[in-house]
Amino acid sequence: SPTDEELSTVYSKDNCENIFNCLINEYVIINDENDNFCDVIRWNGVKYETVWNKTLKTLAFGDKIKSKDVYQRMAFDSLLNNTMTCITGHAGSGKSLISLVTAMHLIETGKYDKIVILFNPCPVKEASQMGYYQGSLIDKAMQSNIGNMLITKFGDRFAVDNYIAQGKIKLIPMTEC
């Protein structure tokens, strides 16, 4: 835990000293003496900034989406503020949903034109191999793990096909990179 003096420096108006020796866009989680979460800050190269618990609303996902824990808060913040973000976590921790909600928010607000998704063309269990059966790249992609994830997150295949037709989502198999 940071000392009272360190916290005083971080929260002062002139907090331009990198007291935790952070890299640019590195986060610091601040807990109290009982190890309860208090705050999360990010070093922007000039000063520490508080990472607010933002709420995103998109046409694609409807209801406002808000982080459920500090790690999701940092993921949302990084996706909104950085050109590249890698999110890790166990299954069900919200990585895909947070990424898609943030990407759709950035598209709907005009900051991005489209989402480009590189996917592994390995099919899900008992689905056809990418190159062996007839069908478009999109049809084959929808049988892969990425297709199942997109259909689950967007609600149905029609919604995914619609975003692809509008050019808002582009699927590229890694074999074509």
Predicted feature residues:
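Feature 3881 marks metal-assisted phosphotransfer/nuclease machinery
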Residues: 2-73, 77, 87
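Conserved phosphate/pyrophosphate-binding and hydrolysis machinery centered on Walker-type P-loop NTPases
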Residues: 65-69, 93, 135-136
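Walker A (P-loop) ATP-phosphate-binding motif of ABC ATPase nucleotide-binding domains
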Residues: 84
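P-loop (Walker A) phosphate-binding loop of NTP-binding proteins
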Residues: 90-91, 120
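Conserved P-loop
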Residues: 97-166
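Conserved RecA-like ASCE ATPase "motif II neighborhood" in helicase/translocase motors
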Residues: 165-177
